[in-house]
Amino acid sequence: AVGYYPSLVESDEYTQTRGDGFLSDLCYAWEKEAKRCPQPTRLVITRFGVVLSPDGGAMQQMLRPLRATKVAAVIGPGTQPFPWIDIRDLCRAMAFFIENEELRGVFNLVAPQAVSQSTFTRAMGKAYHAWTTLIVPQTVFRLLYGEAASFLTAGQSVRPTRLLEAGFHFSVPTIEKLFEETDHSTVDR
């Protein structure tokens, strides 16, 4: 997961610094175990952003309050990065790793378009015809979710540098393209 990286600092696979806290520690521990693979096993470590599907998944959860109230809720202040990837690009990237045996090491699976949480929420609100956008203070999420709120209130600014260098082309490179291709009737269930 991209939670490996420090919050609010632009990072890519060449970044040597890791973040602080539970998520970064968990990612580090997973990767440390993966690196124990015996040689000559080819190891590709993938760090995912939020995986979004035009058919539901995490997007259904994010849309629940919007559908109920017609209000798009920005997690305050909204400036935190929101690293994401379309599930179709994620699947294509996995096939890309399998087909290109020279690839190894760490790869960030995030769209090339970096967006803030506010930008994402406003685009979602526009696509789903929200009446308004409301900024919900981070403290509300901290009270509701405790330390788990950090998944929502802090974000990592992550680039897929190595994936792009390897010649991978994203079919859904922007959040606007994601919402254009979303089957709203499926996600609205």
Residue ranges and their predicted role:
Residues 150-189:
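C-terminal amphipathic/interface module of NAD(P)-dependent oxidoreductases
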Residues 97-147, 180-189:
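Mid/C-terminal beta-alpha module of Rossmann-like enzyme folds, strongest
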Residues 17-23, 49-56, 76-87:
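Glycine-rich "substrate-gating" loop/helix at the edge of Rossmann-like oxidoreductase active sites
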Residues 18-47:
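Active-site Tyr-X1-5-Lys
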Residues 1-20:
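Conserved Rossmann-fold NAD(P)-dependent oxidoreductase catalytic core, especially the SDR/UDP-sugar
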Residues 90, 94, 109, 120, ...:
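Non-catalytic, hydrophobic alpha-helical segments
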Residues 7, 28, 40-41, 52-61, ...:
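Glycine/proline-rich active-site loop of Rossmann-fold NAD(P)-dependent oxidoreductases
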